Amino acid sequence: MDPARKAGAQAMIWTAGWLLLLLLRGGAQALECYSCVQKADDGCSPNKMKTVKCAPGVDVCTEAVGAVETIHGQFSLAVRGCGSGLPGKNDRGLDLHGLLAFIQLQQCAQDRCNAKLNLTSRALDPAGNESAYPPNGVECYSCVGLSREACQGTSPPVVSCYNASDHVYKGCFDGNVTLTAANVTVSLPVRGCVQDEFCTRDGVTGPGFTLSGSCCQGSRCNSDLRNKTYFSPRIPPLVRLPPPEPTTVASTTSVTTSTSAPVRPTSTTKPMPAPTSQTPRQGVEHEASRDEEPRLTGGAAGHQDRSNSGQYPAKGGPQQPHNKGCVAPTAGLAALLLAVAAGVLL
């Protein structure tokens, strides 16, 4: 290879290398965002914010703030960092039985662009001068911007509830507020006076925001409602019915069986004895009618009638076996005696 061609090839190699290096440098340059977490404090103040480089594929910086207000105060949670999704802004207001919440979410696609929301000023209007309202007699534990350690059991301060803005605050609340943004989740407890006395694990949600909890009735009843269930008095209670008495069941069963059982035997067995008992009964009645005549006339016929009474028992008595061969001579003798008696009378 001549020197001119060799120099040209080297120049092309160097040019391609520089272009490749520039491309790799441009692709490796990550998005930079501010990062901080604020939990009812100054965690996102300018002197506490940090700058972070986002992972490859992350195209937006995000910042979110959620403010909660009770009738005794307000606090806010905030998160800044690398986000996901599309650039834009989303605001929403929520109300949970008199607890107010406001959420702001903003995302942008430039370096260090997520410091536009003013987190030092409150996002909600002041709760007002509570001394201007007379207490209504209910007291509740209050957790407004307190840490979870400071809001345990009966440790929080006790506040007197009052009615404001034409609303009655006679219930106590125990719950949590949670804010999730930039792959970070922060949460704080919330306690205070609310308008509902019987809510059970109610909640409201917004973009990456949740406010939930339970209500109770009575002063200082909100020391711990996490594992308790309450039922509204407006719902009919469950009533346990007494078991039925055994005597009632037994009598009902006996009546049913005693009524139905005799019907079948009588309907099936009653025709059976009819042919066997009908013929002897007719024979007895016929012989009785024949014996009645001599008994009225007296004499030997009466003795004959008494002698035949042993062979044919009375109606309803036990049937005795007898000799059928002697029936004809006895009947002939009775007829002869009857003829003799009639001749004597004439």
UniProtKB/Swiss-Prot annotation:
Residues 233-324 are annotated as: Disordered. It is a lipid-anchor; GPI-anchor. The keyword Signal applies. Induction: Up-regulated in migrating keratinocytes during epithelization of incisional skin wounds. A lipid is attached at residue 326 (GPI-anchor amidated cysteine). Residues 1-30 form the signal peptide. Residues 247-269 have a biased composition (Low complexity). GO terms for biological process: cell-matrix adhesion; negative regulation of smooth muscle cell apoptotic process. Residues 234-246 have a biased composition (Pro residues). It is found in: Cell membrane. Pfam families: UPAR_LY6 (PF00021). N-glycosylated and O-glycosylated. One of its GO terms (cellular component) is plasma membrane. CDD domains: TFP_LU_ECD_LYPD3_rpt1, TFP_LU_ECD_LYPD3_rpt2. Keywords: Cell membrane, Glycoprotein, GPI-anchor, Lipoprotein, Membrane, Repeat, Signal. Residues 327-346 form a propeptide. Residues 33-126, 140-222 form the UPAR/Ly6 domain. Residues 283-295 have a biased composition (Basic and acidic residues). Expressed in placenta, skin and urothelium. Found in suprabasal keratinocytes of chronic wounds. Weak expression is found in esophagus and peripheral blood mononuclear cells. Found in the majority of primary and metastatic transitional cell carcinomas (TCCs) and as well in breast cancer tissues, but not in adjacent normal tissues. High expression is found in the tumor component of some noninvasive superficial lesions and in invasive and metastatic urothelial cancers. Glycans are attached at residues 118, 163, 176, 183. GO terms for molecular function: laminin binding. Binds laminin-1 and laminin-5. Interacts with LGALS3. Interacts with AGR2 and AGR3. PANTHER family: LY6_PLAUR DOMAIN-CONTAINING PROTEIN 3 (PTHR10624:SF8), UROKINASE PLASMINOGEN ACTIVATOR SURFACE RECEPTOR-RELATED (PTHR10624). Supports cell migration. May be involved in urothelial cell-matrix interactions. May be involved in tumor progression. This is Ly6/PLAUR domain-containing protein 3. It comes from Homo sapiens (Human).
